[in-house]
Amino acid sequence: MSEKIRTMQGRVISDKMDKSIVVAIERMVKHPIYGKYIKRTTKLHAHDENNECGLGDTVEIRECRPLSKTKSWTLVNIVEKAKA
């Protein structure tokens, strides 16, 4: 059986922890009554083994086994570095 590995793309909003980052995933959802599309944000904690991510970087993460109480995602690659 091959399972589909979930991958997400988002922006790093915190890199202050050692070997960990917080990634904000933005999605658009339709309001059930008014029909207007609203921007919703999900924050995910991800494992960054080499501490290579910086604040504002666009990264790709994938789901993995639980690494801590809140961390179940790991960094795949950095799509775009933030402008310094």
UniProtKB/Swiss-Prot annotation:
Pfam families: Ribosomal_S17
MF-aspect GO terms: rRNA binding; structural constituent of ribosome
GO annotations of cellular component type: cytosolic small ribosomal subunit
Family annotation (Gene3D superfamilies): Nucleic acid-binding proteins
SUPFAM superfamilies named in the record: Nucleic acid-binding proteins (SSF50249)
Sequence similarity: Belongs to the universal ribosomal protein uS17 family.
Subunit structure: Part of the 30S ribosomal subunit.
HAMAP family referenced in this protein's UniProt entry, alphabetically: Ribosomal_uS17_B (MF_01345_B)
Name of the molecule in the record: Small ribosomal subunit protein uS17
Source organism (scientific name): Aliivibrio fischeri (strain ATCC 700601 / ES114)
Encoding gene (name): rpsQ
